[in-house]
């Protein structure tokens, strides 16, 4: 049995289901490229049959990612598998992941079928997927509540049909680690052809046991772990990949396995996913939380100063968190900024140096010194705003006080035209948003607003993340500035541009569909 555990990331498929606003194709690609840098073996990037937008996103990622295997999800339905294959065919290497429920409850109440019919359908669909690729993963949905004898029958049939990976999900986060390990051991005992496939696990955190269950399964013989960065996902979330990866590294003495992950990219990838998905990481989150390497107890601090291993089982540097930070000033040149970005692990393709340096100078003039966390925030915002903008914040001014009604004046560039409006509101941010709504007539409804300090002290950058509702869809926006009202205004303008871009994408998809329809009629 191989001692390498395959890391299967589902941040962009299962993880995205937890988000209040769907990610754009550009945001998904940004995360996919970060996952590729981190070295995930397989990335599941969408459910192509669900929408034209998801199909396009999967296809875009499949075209760009070269070093990780790209995977798409498909139910045991002919159209699902055919559409998944179509979206993936541009990839260097791809996998089709198909699934069907196997527990008595799901078979009876959801599928209204029988186990024999489920097995027959699984065989047919695995064979269909094999027509497109020799890398087919089959999942037994709700395997955690499936009797082991039934599960063994399904697994044996799927392997005989050509499945190369068999995934055992604890779909509802129900099992305990010793139970889950028993399921894996039971399959090795009962399935005669099990050596012809890799056994995978996919766990959920409803009882807080997702990581524990995955590690117990690895100890019992599973050689693929599925999960999401930061543990994002439906309900209580998925297995946190960064936790499993570091547990395998730190406790190699017990597990005796390894991964192909570049551990130095863990922290940066985690931060990127948090920012793009607008899901802050709890301070006490294992591995990547801001408190993961903090020591407040005097006894602990003394022990760490004498020897870090007294209270640290891994170092911040082991996940790419460099604690030595260089500060730059307005006198620092472009070369110094580029050198620092290189030292932090950024490639030139990940940011626009001209735009970054311009933003750096403006910030340095305001706050004097610019630190690593400032540069990272500027690079992230710059990447988010690289796409063509229809709306641009030209000017804003607010007046408010303890006894005054907040008033805002806003100038907004809308294409080639600059429009201005003023409005009152319940505070300066609301006044700015009311003025912007008057200018655009979009009538955007604010659903969520959050403010995060990027840095330390009174001159820290403030990042505002908002989720807004427009025509039944939710859109995410982000803004960054030393002034909170300015950050808020930029976040709303980002939302407007995302709405505008979504409309443009929809027009393009309709144009392509009409073009294809016309070609069919011609034929």
Swiss-Prot record:
Pathway: Amino-acid biosynthesis; L-leucine biosynthesis; L-leucine from 3-methyl-2-oxobutanoate: step 1/4. This is 2-isopropylmalate synthase. It catalyses: 3-methyl-2-oxobutanoate + acetyl-CoA + H2O = (2S)-2-isopropylmalate + CoA + H(+). The gene is leuA. It is an enzyme of class 2 (transferase). Coiled coil: none annotated. Catalyzes the condensation of the acetyl group of acetyl-CoA with 3-methyl-2-oxobutanoate (2-ketoisovalerate) to form 3-carboxy-3-hydroxy-4-methylpentanoate (2-isopropylmalate). Mn(2+) binds at residues 14, 202, 204, 238. It comes from Escherichia coli (strain SMS-3-5 / SECEC). SUPFAM superfamilies: 2-isopropylmalate synthase LeuA, allosteric (dimerisation) domain (SSF110921), Aldolase (SSF51569). Its cofactor is Mn(2+). Residues 392-523 are annotated as: Regulatory domain. InterPro entries: 2-IPM_HCS-like (IPR050073), 2-isopropylmalate_synth_dimer (IPR013709), AIPM/Hcit_synth_CS (IPR002034), Aldolase_TIM (IPR013785), LeuA/HCS_post-cat (IPR054691), LeuA_allosteric_dom_sf (IPR036230), LeuA_bact_synth (IPR005671), PYR_CT (IPR000891). One of its GO terms (molecular function) is acetyl-CoA C-acetyltransferase activity.
């Amino acid at each position: 049995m191989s001692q390498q555990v395959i890391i299967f990331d589902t941040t962009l498929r299962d993880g995205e289901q937890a988000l209040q606003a769907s990610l754009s194709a550009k945001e998904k690609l940004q995360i996919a490229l970060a996952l590729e840098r981190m070295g995930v073996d397989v990335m599941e990037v969408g459910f192509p049959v669900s929408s034209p937008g998801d199909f396009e996103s999967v296809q875009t990622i499949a075209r760009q990612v070269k070093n990780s295997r790209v995977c798409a999800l498909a139910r045991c339905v002919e159209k699902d598998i055919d559409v998944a294959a179509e979206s993936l065919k541009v990839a260097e290497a791809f996998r089709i992941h198909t699934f069907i429920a196997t527990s008595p409850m799901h078979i009876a109440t959801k599928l209204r079928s029988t186990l024999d019919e489920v097995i027959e359908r699984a065989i047919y669909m695995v064979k269909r997927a094999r027509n497109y690729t020799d890398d087919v993963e089959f999942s037994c949905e709700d395997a955690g509540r499936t009797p082991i004898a039934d599960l063994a029958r399904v697994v044996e049939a799927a392997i005989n049909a050509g499945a190369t990976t068999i995934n055992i999900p604890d779909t509802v986060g129900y099992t305990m680690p010793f139970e889950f390990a028993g399921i894996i051991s039971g399959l090795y005992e009962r399935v005669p052809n099990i050596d012809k496939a890799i056994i995978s696990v996919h766990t959920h955190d409803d009882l807080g046991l997702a990581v524990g269950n995955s590690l117990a399964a690895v100890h019992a013989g599973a050689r693929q772990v599925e999960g999401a960065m930061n543990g994002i996902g439906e309900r209580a979330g998925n297995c946190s990949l960064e936790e499993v990866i570091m547990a395998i590294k730190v406790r190699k003495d017990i597990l005796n396995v390894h991964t192909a992950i570049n551990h130095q990219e863990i922290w940066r990838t985690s931060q990127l996913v948090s920012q793009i998905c607008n899901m802050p990481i709890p301070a006490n989150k294992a591995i990547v939380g801001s408190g993961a390497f903090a020591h407040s107890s005097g006894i602990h601090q003394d022990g760490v100063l004498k020897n870090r291993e007294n209270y640290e089982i891994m170092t911040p540097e082991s996940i790419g968190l460099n604690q030595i930070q260089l500060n730059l000033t307005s006198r620092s040149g472009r070369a110094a900024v580029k050198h620092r970005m290189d030292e932090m692990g950024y490639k030139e393709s990940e940011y626009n140096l001209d735009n970054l340096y311009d933003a750096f100078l403006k910030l340095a003039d305001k706050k004097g010194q610019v630190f690593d966390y400032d540069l990272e925030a500027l690079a992230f915002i710059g990447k988010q705003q690289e796409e063509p903008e229809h709306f641009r914040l030209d000017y804003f001014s607010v007046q408010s006080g303890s006894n005054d009604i907040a008033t805002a004046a806003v100038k907004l560039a809308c294409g080639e035209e600059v429009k201005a409006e003023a409005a009152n509101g319940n505070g300066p941010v609301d006044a700015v948003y009311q003025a912007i709504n008057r200018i655009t007539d979009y009538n955007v409804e604010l659903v969520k607003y959050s403010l995060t300090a990027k840095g330390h002290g009174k001159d820290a950058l403030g990042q505002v993340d908002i989720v807004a509702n427009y025509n039944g869809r939710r859109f995410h926006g982000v803004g960054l500035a030393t002034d909170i009202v300015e950050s808020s205004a930029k976040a709303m303008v980002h939302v407007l541009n995302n709405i505008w871009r979504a409309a443009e994408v929809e027009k393009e998809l309709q144009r392509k569909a009409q073009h294809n329809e016309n070609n069919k009629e011609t034929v």
